[in-house]
Regions:
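C-terminal substrate-binding/active-site "lid" region of AdoMet-derived donor-dependent transferases
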Residues: 56-112
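C-terminal capping/lid region of NAD(P)-dependent oxidoreductase domains
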Residues: 114-116
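Active-site segment flanking the S-adenosylmethionine/decSAM binding pocket
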Residues: 25-67
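Short, well-ordered alpha-helical microsegments
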Residues: 7, 50-54, 76-77
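Short beta->alpha hinge that forms the Motif I/post-I loop of the SAM-binding pocket
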Residues: 1-6, 46, 71
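S-adenosyl-L-methionine
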Residues: 2-39
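C-terminal lobe and adjacent flexible extensions of AdoMet/dcAdoMet transferase-like proteins
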Residues: 118-121
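Short, hinge-like loop/turn segments at secondary-structure boundaries
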Residues: 14-21, 42, 84-86, 110
Length: 121
């Protein structure tokens, strides 16, 4: 994660929930990838560099498992072809929808992210 605020939030969540096997890296450049142990699972916030991110991760671990997060339908629609291209199978897509009430007891929708999973067998 290259956004400092988002990275800080992720690091706070790792500490708060006691998840000690999570490493947040600033980017997927070759320099960053060289500094980390071989991951078995990656959680990616999808962006315009998703294909390059997948390529770099598969170079580090050809049997990688993926979890991809996006709010954008156009990104979601492009993931299946990418998974097919790189031999990533067992694709599952899940959308999480949360609503809460405001002070007037009115429902307020929250962002409804898509989580897409897949793995190279």
């Amino acid at each position: 994660e290259n956004d400092k605020g988002a990275k800080d939030t992720m690091e706070d969540n790792v500490k708060q929930f006691g998840v000690h096997n999570v490493q947040i890296i600033p980017d997927l450049s070759e320099g960053s990838m060289a500094k980390i142990p071989t991951p078995r699972l990656s959680f990616i916030v999808a962006n315009k560099h998703l294909e390059e991110d997948i390529q770099r991760l598969l170079k580090k671990n050809p049997k990688m498992q993926f979890v991809i997060y996006t709010l954008e339908l156009n990104i979601l629609s492009g993931i299946k072809p990418l998974f097919d291209k790189y031999g990533i199978s067992n694709m599952e897509v899940l959308q999480i929808n949360v609503a809460k009430t405001n002070k007037d007891s009115m429902f307020v929708n929250q962002p409804a992210p898509w989580l897409i999973t897949g793995e190279v067998l």
